[in-house]
Amino acid sequence: MKVTKLYLVRHGQTIWHAENRYAGSSDIALTADGEDEAERLAGWATSTGPDGVYSSSLVRARRTAEPSARALGLDVVEHHDLREVDFGQGEGLTRGEMAGRFPDALDAFLRAPAENPLPSGERGLDAIARARPVVDDIVAQHREGSALLVLHSTLLRLLLCDLLGIEPNRYRSLFPRVANCAVSTVGIGETMALLGLNVPPA
């Protein structure tokens, strides 16, 4: 069976990660460690050889993708619809801070995170609806090849659920953590298959 491989990668570390703050659609830069992670990802890309490099339009994703694209002699193709879920009033806050400001909304979000957005935020289901067509177009462009997509923690997990036919509200329980610059590989052919999850770039 002929397979197209998608390498889904979370961007490198940002200053908000150490504090466990929800970055969402906020345009937060990488830390020095995040830049180093991006360089290690480029080493992985050199040995793996994806045919295309794509990223969210947010700077933390683009800066993570750029070293890999340079190493491969490619340009980064940005897509605004691959940006992270917008967490509304939760942007920049820790979960503890959210519990103090809007506890009921946080509880609903944690119970069914794809259906219940944080106040003034975006539903996970709507994020899937905007991002999945982009992913499908990338698959069509790289039929029987491969592509590297630099994304964000929540959107990446939502897309894994959608691609694999998993109920999207389960993204937290099934995929509790995606490490910065770790690679999750989905094989797309007659069926979808998870070929690797959260693998550090070697």
Language model features: what each stretch is:
Residues 153-157:
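GST superfamily/GST-like fold recognition
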Residues 55-56, 129, 150-151:
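Short beta-strand scaffold positions
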Residues 34-51, 136-138, 185-187:
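A short, N-terminal amphipathic alpha-helix
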Residues 40-106:
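Phosphate-coordination/substrate-recognition cap region in phosphate-metabolizing enzymes
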Residues 11, 152:
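Short, conserved phosphate/pyrophosphate- and ester-handling motifs at nucleotide-, phospho-/glycolipid
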Residues 105-126:
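Short glycine/proline- and acidic residue-enriched helix-loop micro-motifs
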Residues 1-4, 85-97, 140-146, 161-202:
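Acidic, low-complexity terminal tails and accessory targeting/binding regions
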Residues 14-27:
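Glycine-rich N-terminal loop/short-helix segment of MobA-like nucleotidyltransferase
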